[in-house]
Curated annotation (Swiss-Prot):
It holds the Pfam family Aminotran_1_2. Disulfide bonds: none annotated. It is an enzyme of class 2 (transferase). This is Serine palmitoyltransferase 3. It comes from Mus musculus. Expressed in white and brown adipose tissues. The modification N6-(pyridoxal phosphate)lysine is found at residue 371.
Length: 563
């Protein structure tokens, strides 16, 4: 343990008094975080009290009606396919050529059928064209269709001042140019927009190194490697860590980028039930006892892959128990903090900080710069030898163009604001405001009678709508009321669990939230999607009290805020 007398507390984390540039800070400094006295007086927990992340189920009739709706849609879909085959109705869908009928099908049968006959009916709920910065208010171009959603055209009109509940602007750092972006402008003048090379050739700039050093300080790890694309950070780098003869234990709700990267690795993949430590331990025990299929040899590596905040569920990984299992069975842990870094934990350092765990408990930190930090790209952090190996072996460093220096400058700006080094409104104020917005919005939705998934610390708030017709109606109605929200359905979710997903931001004012809640309340009555009273399922997520960084975090997890 570092000596507090020789170190400074910066943004709630113990750091050496020497900064990145080698300059000393005063040993008593407090930057946007927790004082040394608070660190010294932090209470240890004597009890092991469980905390539940409630999972609520709709009444049975809702599932019955949802499947009936799909059944009717499928029947009409077959009827329309019959009419298309006989030329009665024009077919706008992509089809196989007759001479290639004996080839491997280009489209999976049901997914192609679903897209052609069901998704196409509600396709107007997605892919809107935004023509402004993703600020709390934004502008969207109006679109119409002349062929039942097969194609769209813009009318030339712009829908202005839409309340933005769809963008991942968690800390409110995305926006038009202001005085804090002077360095971004200077970087553009000095470096230009593009790098025109890969990281392993001529594409590593000093500003990339500065960004990576700052991110390593923020994460409290030895080294960080940055990448130009968040999706590729998972897809192209998981194969670097595991390959044939290795086992990946992946949460069933992990992101598509994790799934793709796992498949590309050649490792054996076994999903475990969402956030279920008991099921994960069962798979770990079986893997160690039985070994590799066919030969029974021991696995070269066992890699557990989880997310910090699950973007479709709004749930937070049960990290304390996952880490305990990782240590018990000598596995490795890879965590994707795309939706948790910057906005979760007392100082925004993610779920590791929220649970009060040691930074070395996690082997590979992955995250994106697109959410809290309002840029683009991703990063992987950890021990220096891991990151150095990644620099040499990753397809993203060998073949992909480096991150734009302008984006790197924006990310440095965002990180410094989050860490309290710059900005009129520091990271702690933004994180606290985001936390208050999340708790207020979730509480009000629950009081109205909606089914809400996820955790009270999650900036993602899913509202369950179930029926696909209600999913599209929800989106269309809100857009008419100048509110934007993401709606999600199959295959991004299970077939019956269509939902709306509200993304919270510290930039949302209470007046904005009240406006949205008033409209959503009216819409909930209109669509009959207030399913209270509800029956709680046994699928609860269990947390240990000792896993939290401080008592306030634990108490807030399972206490209702005051009105």
């Amino acid at each position: 343990m570092a000596n507090l007398n020789d170190s400074a507390v910066t943004n709630g984390t113990l750091h050496n008094p020497k900064t990145q540039q080698g300059k000393r800070q005063s040993t008593g400094c407090v930057k946007n975080g927790i004082s040394k006295e608070a660190q010294q007086n932090r209470k240890a927990y004597a009890e092991d009290k469980p905390v539940f992340e409630p999972y609520q189920e709709a009444p049975l009739y809702v599932y019955v009606l949802t499947y009936m709706g799909y059944g009717i849609g499928i029947l009409f879909g077959y009827l329309r396919d019959f009419m298309r085959n006989w030329g009665i109705e024009k077919c706008n869908a992509a089809v196989e050529r007759e001479e290639q009928k004996d080839f491997v099908p280009l489209y999976q049968d049901f997914e192609n059928f679903y897209k052609r006959n069901l998704y196409m009916r509600i396709r107007d709920s997605w892919s809107h064209t935004v023509c402004s910065a993703p600020e709390p208010y934004m502008n969207v171009m109006e679109k119409v269709t002349d062929d039942y959603n097969w194609t769209f055209r813009h009318t030339g009109k712009v829908i202005e001042n839409i309340i933005n509940m769809a963008s991942y602007n968690y800390l409110g750092l995305a926006g038009k140019y202001d005085d804090s972006m002077v360095r971004v402008k200077d970087t553009l003048e000095k470096y230009g927009v593009g790098v025109a090379s890969t990281r392993n050739e001529m594409g590593t700039l000093d500003i990339h190194k500065e960004l990576e050093d700052l991110m390593a300080e923020f994460l409290n790890v030895e080294a960080v490697m940055s990448f130009g694309m968040g999706f590729a950070t998972n897809a192209m780098n998981i194969p670097v860590f595991v390959g044939k003869g290795c086992l990946i234990l992946s949460d069933e709700f992990n992101h598509t980028s994790v799934i793709l990267g796992s498949r590309l690795s050649g490792a054996v993949i076994r999903p475990f039930k969402h956030n279920n430590a008991e099921n994960l331990e069962k798979l770990l025990r079986e893997a160690i006892i039985r070994g590799q299929p066919g030969t029974g040899r021991a696995w070269k590596k066992i890699l557990i892959v989880v997310e910090g905040v699950y973007s479709m569920e709004g749930s937070i990984v049960n990290l304390a128990q996952i880490v305990a299992l990782k240590k018990k069975y000598k596995a490795y842990l890879y965590i994707d903090e795309a939706h948790s870094i910057g906005c979760t934990g007392p100082t925004g350092r993610g779920v590791r900080e929220l649970f009060g765990l040691d930074p070395e408990d996690i082997d590979v930190y992955m995250g994106t710069f697109t959410k809290s930090f309002s840029g683009s790209g991703g990063y992987i952090g950890g021990k220096k030898e891991i990151v150095d190996y990644l620099r040499m072996q990753s397809h993203s460093t060998t073949y992909a163009t480096s991150m734009s220096p302008v984006v790197a400058a924006q990310l440095i700006r965002s990180l410094k604001i989050t860490m309290g080094y710059e900005g009129n409104i520091g990271g702690m104020e933004r994180i606290q405001q985001l936390k208050e917005n999340i708790k207020y919005f979730r509480r009000r939705l629950k009081e109205m009678g909606f089914i809400i998934y996820g955790n009270d610390f999650s900036p993602v708030i899913p509202v369950l709508l179930y029926m696909p017709a209600k999913v599209s109606a929800f989106s269309r109605f809100l857009l008419k009321k100048k509110i934007s929200v993401v709606v999600v359905g199959f295959p991004a979710t299970s077939l019956p669990e269509g939902r709306a997903r509200f993304s919270m931001s510290s930039a949302h004012t209470r007046e904005m939230l009240d406006t949205v809640l008033e409209v959503v309340d009216e819409l909930g009555d209109l669509l009959n999607v207030k399913y209270f009273p509800l029956k709680k399922s046994g699928r609860a997520i269990l947390y240990n009290k000792e896993g939290f960084d401080n008592e306030a975090s634990f108490e807030e997890m399972h206490s209702e805020p005051e009105a």
